[in-house]
Amino acid sequence: MSTAIASARLQALNAGSAASTHLAECLAVDFAALLQAVAPTLPPAAIQRMRAAAGKGITQRMALAAALLREAGQGDVQHWQAHSSDTVRGWACYLIGADAQATLADKLQAMRPLADDPHFGVREWAWLALRSDIVAGPLEALALLQPWAQQPSLHLRRFACEALRPRGVWATHIALFKQQPEHVLPLLETLADDPERYVQDSVGNWLNDAGKNQPDWVRTVCKKWQSTRDSVANAYIRKRALRSL
């Protein structure tokens, strides 16, 4: 299937008047053009810095956009998190994540509506923007996120698991959970029969991550679950967890 994006569609994405519908569109956004469109009073030097960063990875450019907005006195999270562009709402995530005065608990509270955003991309930026804090204090993050695993919102339940993945996608690894994944077992147990496939995928991926360093532990957990849990959801999670192990 072709991933070519029509010119008019790309213009709308770069103007901030449309949200992306798939990953290829997310990656195709011209950050300098979007920044200039949504924050027209930014100094030209700021736009040039973003233009010069065009070849960098997308997570680096997300963080840079937030930094440029903050430096220009335009770092109002509430303003940006209400924007129609999912990329701009992602910048709001990075504004929260880069707040040096906020504790992790404060950041998680501020991030909550973005972690529950209707757009798939914003929900990913929400945990990626906090990843450095989580890596720096994984047990604190685990304690703070345990209650999220019991929330009515499937997005928040998934966030609780995805944010703590030992490896993750586009993310710094969490060394403690790679070597001692048992710390997270109570949270995984909470989600072990989750009815939503979106959450099941995250739990299965979490265990598969852990299995790259601790395969015997993952096999033991799955064997126990096989004998104590008979849900279709858990069977799916176990299959996903054990793939490639």
What do these predicted ranges mean?
Residues 1-245:
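Surface-facing alpha-helical segments and adjacent helix-coil boundary elements at the starts of domains
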